[in-house]
UniProtKB/Swiss-Prot annotation:
Family according to the record: Belongs to the MRE11/RAD32 family.
HAMAP family: Mre11 (MF_02044)
Keywords: DNA damage, DNA repair, Endonuclease, Exonuclease, Hydrolase, Manganese, Metal-binding, Nuclease
Active site: H85 (proton donor)
Name of the molecule in the record: DNA double-strand break repair protein Mre11
Organism: Pyrococcus horikoshii (strain ATCC 700860 / DSM 12428 / JCM 9974 / NBRC 100139 / OT-3)
Primary gene name: mre11
Length: 413
């Protein structure tokens, strides 16, 4: 058996307000589908965020319909779940429209029972768990859910996903053990040990950098986004050390072909994102670093200069000498540490891990792109605070020394 595992396609994303980028996201998806046909896969899994929005434009929907004709015309079924970008809070999503058009099959918890060549349903409480079917293999999954939901429903989640036969699990979630290594600023709703056991392959989405690990003997795989979604997902990062640049290579972009449950990454060439990090004490040093970076910047790349300085100065001249397709300049005063009574204090120590993540995301150049993540972090954090307050109230009441003397206990005796 051979299938393709894609995620985070983000159709319709006019990155940096550039319609050209939405076209590039669509063209990369087209390349991936054509590669799937060439590889003669049996089916395709899209592990969330086919669209960048739950309300894509008519033009974006039209593009999706056109592109999904590629697997349909080659008799390749596509199984999909909703991600945090394209899910709806209630009712059908645009994915269900594509399902009605016969272009893909939506798996997960649904209000209605669905039975056809590639879908079957199992009653779960007030819902139907709709599962994909291909030969003797089942494809289980559900749409993106928040940290607060998993905190309240983890046992339910583990209870409904119990494979009796060969099966794949498809999720669009952050796994903490993985996000801490790949994308520390990402919110994570689950630990690796929270995943239900017994699946032959865990097809994940949500994290935009590719990553492979195992859960027991089964592969746990993030293919990453097809295109570079922000500058955190760079092709190359240049870090100035005061003399020269140290180069950090980012992750490749593409998807996985999985044959007999063994994943193989398929690379797709996409536009380069270059992240240039310069920290300097003087205007002279920063100018020297900017000029030294020029030979490392391809003409058609998107570039971000991340400049940290002691004292601001005009940086408009950078736009005149950097020959790139797109240029963004982010500046910040060096203020990692504050002085308190003559002692150096790490500013992070004043915040919890969740609070610092929110501050980090909110101060990013791509703030608007991270709104969903910030909301998820805050909703989970509020839930935790509420629970801790309740537990605190409960702890204030101790059992009476003599359980039979309730009046003495109430008097404090």
């Amino acid at each position: 058996m051979k299938f393709a595992h894609l995620a985070d396609v983000h159709l319709g994303y006019e990155q940096f307000n550039k319609p050209q980028r939405a076209e590039e996201f669509a063209n990369t998806f087209k390349k991936a589908l054509e590669m799937c046909v060439k590889e003669s896969v049996d089916f395709i899994i899209i592990a969330g965020d086919l669209f960048n929005s739950s309300r894509p434009s008519p033009g974006t929907i039209k593009t999706a319909i056109k592109l999904l004709q590629i697997p349909k015309e080659n008799n390749i079924p596509v199984f999909a779940i909703e991600g945090n970008h394209d899910r709806t809070q209630r009712g059908p999503s645009v994915l269900h429209l594509l399902e009605d058009l016969g272009l893909l099959y939506v798996i997960g918890l649904r209000q209605e029972r669905v039975e056809n060549e590639y879908l079957t349903s199992e009653r779960v409480g007030n819902y139907w768990l709709v599962k994909g079917v291909y030969d003797n293999l089942e494809i289980h999954g559900m749409k993106y859910m928040s940290s607060a939901w998993f905190e309240a429903n983890l046992n339910f989640f583990k209870g409904i996903f119990r494979p009796d036969e060969d099966a794949i699990l498809v999720l669009h979630q952050g796994i903490r053990d993985i996000t801490e290594k790949v994308f520390p600023s990402y919110s994570a709703e689950l630990k690796l040990s929270d995943l239900p056991r017994g699946y032959l392959y865990y097809a994940l989405g949500h994290v935009h950098k590719r990553f492979e690990t195992n859960y027991g003997d089964s592969p746990v795989v993030y293919p990453g986004s097809l295109e570079r979604w922000d500058f955190g997902d760079y092709a190359k990062r240049l870090v100035w050390n005061g003399v020269t640049f140290r180069e950090e290579v980012g992750s490749d972009k593409g998807f996985y072909i999985v044959e007999d449950f063994t994943p193989r990454f398929v690379n797709i060439k996409v536009r380069d994102f270059i992240d240039v990090v310069i920290k300097g004490d003087s205007e002279r040093e920063i100018k020297k670093a900017v000029k030294a970076s020029l030979p490392h910047i391809p003409r058609n790349s998107y570039v971000r200069f991340n400049i940290k300085w002691r004292k601001p100065f005009d940086v408009e001249w950078i736009k005149e000498i950097v020959n790139a397709e797109y240029l963004r300049i982010h500046t910040a005063i060096i203020k990692d540490e504050k002085s308190m009574n003559g002692e150096s204090v790490d500013i992070k120590s004043f915040f919890t891990e969740q609070e610092w993540k929110v501050i980090d995301l909110a101060s990013s150049d791509e703030f608007e792109s991270y709104i969903e993540k910030i909301v998820d972090i805050l909703s989970g954090y509020e839930k935790k605070e509420e629970r801790e307050k309740k537990e605190s109230k409960i702890r204030k009441f101790e059992r009476p020394k003599n359980p039979g003397d309730l009046t003495a206990w109430l008097r404090g005796g």
